[in-house]
């Protein structure tokens, strides 16, 4: 079975490896190299690096809408195109080019959290479970019928990065199961997504990571977890902007204004919120590295009342 794989970030690498392990991946599509790092040099995507290591031809078109891009894809004579966090829109002509169409590995239990950031939005919303769907792609945004799915619980203190890694591995397994069925001549039964329960996981940006202490502590704690390791929650603490890498909500009654430092110890720095308090455990000063609350207090000798 001739497979064309399309993906870009780390999340897609496990699925590429699963596809290449037992099947013929004739080409990999990934986004063009982007400037990255302090030197802003052009950097290949994680998927490109893995494909090169496997000797798989790599294509990096700016768009798939051109006649030339479609002709190139058709010339590969794919039986199936597997798409995992690719980042480019697939027009109808591309969706129809492979014999079996295009499959997508999506990191949510569709129709909940269609869109670009399902992992982070699930944590931010306080979901207790999520999962991975293998979907037959169609023109709509993550609207296609589901072929296979797997469900997992979200840990109480699980971060976006930790859940990302678990779902990347789970997605690779679900894809492997689907490819195994197709190779055996068994096409997975496509289940249309229900009309109820549709939500959208809008793309993350740094502005969303700025915390407002007037919000409930529980919501802020979820955002700290969701936005770790990117874009990383940030807030004003004791007069300086810091990034928050670890925090928990406290069910603590108080009469203080949001943003007031309530207490501090080796266990964390407690900050008044609109409801409850947020205990900051790991944080990062501008230009520094992530440190514990205890190390932060040692560095902030100007806060004797909190020591």
Swiss-Prot record:
The reaction(s) this protein catalyses: L-methionyl-tRNA(fMet) + (6R)-10-formyltetrahydrofolate = N-formyl-L-methionyl-tRNA(fMet) + (6S)-5,6,7,8-tetrahydrofolate + H(+)
Entry binding sites for (6S)-5,6,7,8-tetrahydrofolate: 108-111
Domain of life of the native organism: Bacteria
GO molecular function: methionyl-tRNA formyltransferase activity
Record-annotated disulphide pairs: none
GO annotation, cellular component aspect: cytosol
Family listed: Belongs to the Fmt family.
Keyword Transmembrane helix set for record: no
Key words of the record: Protein biosynthesis, Transferase
EC code(s) of this entry: 2.1.2.9
Role description: Attaches a formyl group to the free amino group of methionyl-tRNA(fMet). The formyl group appears to play a dual role in the initiator identity of N-formylmethionyl-tRNA by promoting its recognition by IF2 and preventing the misappropriation of this tRNA by the elongation apparatus.
GO terms for biological process, alphabetical: conversion of methionyl-tRNA to N-formyl-methionyl-tRNA
NCBIfam families cross-referenced by the UniProt entry: fmt
Transmembrane segments: none
Name recorded for this polypeptide: Methionyl-tRNA formyltransferase
């Amino acid at each position: 079975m001739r497979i064309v794989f399309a993906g870009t970030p780390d999340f897609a690498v496990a699925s590429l490896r699963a596809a290449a392990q037992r099947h013929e991946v004739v080409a990999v599509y990934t986004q063009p190299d982007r400037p990255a790092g302090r030197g802003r040099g052009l950097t290949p995507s994680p998927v490109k690096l893995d494909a090169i290591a496997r000797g798989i031809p790599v294509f990096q078109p700016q768009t798939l809408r051109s006649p030339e891009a479609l002709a190139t894809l058709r010339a590969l004579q794919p039986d199936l195109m597997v798409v995992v966090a690719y980042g480019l829109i697939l027009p109808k002509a591309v969706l129809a080019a492979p014999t079996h169409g295009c499959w997508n590995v999506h990191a949510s239990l569709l129709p909940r959290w269609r869109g670009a950031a399902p992992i982070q939005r699930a944590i931010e919303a306080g979901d207790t479970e999520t999962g991975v769907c293998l979907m037959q792609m169609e023109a709509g945004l993550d609207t296609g019928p589901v072929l296979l799915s797997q469900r997992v619980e979200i840990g109480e203190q699980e971060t976006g990065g930790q859940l990302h890694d678990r779902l990347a591995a789970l997605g690779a397994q679900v894809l492997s199961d689907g490819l195994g069925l197709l190779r055996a001549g068994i096409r997975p039964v496509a289940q249309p997504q229900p009309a109820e329960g549709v939500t959208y996981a809008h793309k993350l940006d740094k502005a969303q990571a700025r915390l407002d202490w007037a919000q409930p502590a529980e919501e802020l704690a979820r955002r700290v977890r969701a936005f770790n390791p990117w874009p990383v929650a940030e807030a004003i603490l004791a007069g300086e902007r810091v990034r928050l890498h670890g925090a928990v909500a406290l069910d603590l009654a108080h009469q203080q204004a949001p943003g007031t430092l309530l207490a501090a110890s080796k266990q964390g720095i407690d900050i008044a919120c609109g409801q409850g308090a947020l205990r900051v455990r790991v944080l990062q000063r501008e230009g520094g590295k992530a440190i514990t609350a205890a190390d932060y207090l040692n560095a902030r000798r100007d806060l004797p009342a909190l020591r």
